[in-house]
Amino acid sequence: RVLFRSAQKTIVSTQIGSEFISDLPDQEDMRFRRHTNFGVGELGEDGYVTDFSWGYQLTLKSTYANVIGPVALTPSLTMKHGVEGYSSDDALQEDERSLGLGVGMSYKKLSADLSYTTYNDAKYSVVNDRDYLSLSTTYNF
């Protein structure tokens, strides 16, 4: 509570995404797009594109000005969850979850961002065996 009160601003963001494919044949008749990592499955198996898929993403981000002199810090937390179904572009995968932690720093014209994302072990996820670390810097002139 104290951290949020001392923040210059705090942003809470919720995004909900879905995909509906109206004329997708039943999986007993024809299946579409399961990643080749999982091989050819039996008819009716999971992991193939479904007619409906949805998920959500929650983000919390706060800005703390003048933390050390004129340096501002911006920590962030992002959670993503594929709730149901498999989208045609792999953006929504049932039971796939990720957690991202980040911190940004800005000083005059220089800024830097460091973030780390980890994924759970959803059954048909192609990213469940990896994590993601990112560092970027920017100088405005």
Feature locations, PLM:
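Transmembrane beta-strands of outer-membrane beta-barrel pores
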Residues: 16-22, 62-66, 79-85, 107-109, ...
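Outer-membrane beta-barrel "beta-signal"
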Residues: 129-141
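Membrane-embedded beta-strand positions of outer-membrane beta-barrel proteins
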Residues: 12-16, 75-77, 103, 112-114, ...
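Outer-membrane beta-barrel architecture
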Residues: 1, 59-61, 76, 100-104, ...
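Short sequence motifs at beta-strands and strand-loop junctions characteristic
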Residues: 46-54, 93-95, 127-129
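Solvent-exposed loop segments that connect transmembrane elements
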Residues: 23-45
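Extracellular loop and loop/strand-boundary signature of outer-membrane beta-barrel proteins
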Residues: 42-48, 85-90, 121-125
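Short loop/turn motifs that connect adjacent beta-strands in outer-membrane beta-barrel proteins
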Residues: 4-12, 65-74, 104-106
